[in-house]
């Protein structure tokens, strides 16, 4: 079955301060953040990959830029966070697991190559960077078996930070949908993951990609760092 990929692109991206949706931010190589994500997905998983983009803010711009994928509309994009965007996408997903990306992650396709076997084997995971633990970033800790037991911006004694590339297996998906539904409107999707871990013991593995290129673009400095990869 073709892989299902969701890109979360509904938010307003106010911190970067651009007049367009953040995923359409141009990179130094001439592509947008969103375009490089889609090209990486197609390169690694083939043209049959089923890509859905969750849209909201200035959705027409994204629809025009990417007419060959499907779309999910979060009409409450200005009142809700990523928990509700992901919830909408998972509810209309097909059977099998779902890989999802934050719409502001610039990364090398080698990241997808590293995780492809886990996706085929339907093992839920969160990609992490253990070389940095930013105060503003979503951080994690693990239990004695190396499975994630905490995932939020408030985590103490964190082992690293999440980079915005994640996978939920088909068997775990219903639990995540239930807990995303239970999240507050302003929760990040990571809260839904935490609740699914706490309530159902869902096993989410951290996959270390510290040695590979991946940057989540929140501020101009992040964009500069992302662009340095293309120079």
Regions found by a protein language model. Give the residues of each.
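N-terminal nucleotide-binding beta1-loop-alpha1 segment
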Residues: 1-19
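Conserved alpha/beta core of the MobA/IspD/sugar-nucleotide pyrophosphorylase nucleotidyltransferase superfamily
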Residues: 2-3, 161-231
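Conserved N-terminal catalytic core of the sugar/cofactor nucleotidyltransferase
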Residues: 2-4, 31-98
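Short beta-strand/turn micro-motifs composed of small residues
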Residues: 9, 28, 55, 102, ...
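A short, conserved beta-strand element in the Rossmann-like catalytic core
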Residues: 15, 105-107, 213
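A structural signal for short hydrophobic beta-strand segments in well-ordered beta-sheet cores
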Residues: 24, 140-142, 206
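Short beta-strand-to-loop acidic/aromatic patch adjacent to the donor-nucleotide binding site
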Residues: 96-106
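Conserved core of the sugar-phosphate nucleotidyltransferase
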Residues: 108-183
């Amino acid at each position: 079955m073709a892989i299902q990929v969701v890109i979360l692109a509904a938010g307003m991206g106010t911190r970067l301060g651009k007049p367009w949706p953040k995923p359409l931010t141009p990179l130094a190589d001439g592509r947008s953040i969103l375009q490089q994500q889609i090209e990486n997905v197609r390169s690694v998983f083939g043209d049959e990959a089923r890509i859905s983009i969750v849209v909201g803010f200035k959705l027409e711009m994204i629809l025009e830029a990417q007419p060959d994928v499907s779309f999910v509309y979060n009409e409450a994009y200005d009142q809700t966070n990523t928990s509700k965007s992901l919830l909408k996408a998972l509810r209309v997903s097909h059977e099998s697991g779902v890989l999802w990306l934050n719409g502001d992650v610039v990364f090398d396709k080698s990241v997808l190559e590293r995780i492809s076997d886990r996706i085929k084997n339907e093992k839920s995971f969160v990609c992490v960077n253990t070389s940095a633990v930013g105060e503003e970033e979503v951080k994690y800790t693990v239990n004695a078996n190396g499975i994630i037991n905490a995932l939020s911006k408030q985590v103490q004694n964190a082992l690293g930070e999440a980079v915005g590339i994640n996978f939920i297996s088909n068997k775990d998906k219903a639990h995540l949908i239930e807990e995303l539904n239970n999240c507050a409107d302003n929760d990040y999707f990571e809260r839904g993951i935490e609740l699914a871990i706490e309530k159902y013991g869902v096993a989410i593995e951290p996959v270390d990609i510290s040695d590979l290129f991946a940057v989540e673009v929140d501020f101009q400095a992040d964009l500069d760092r992302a662009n340095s990869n293309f120079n």
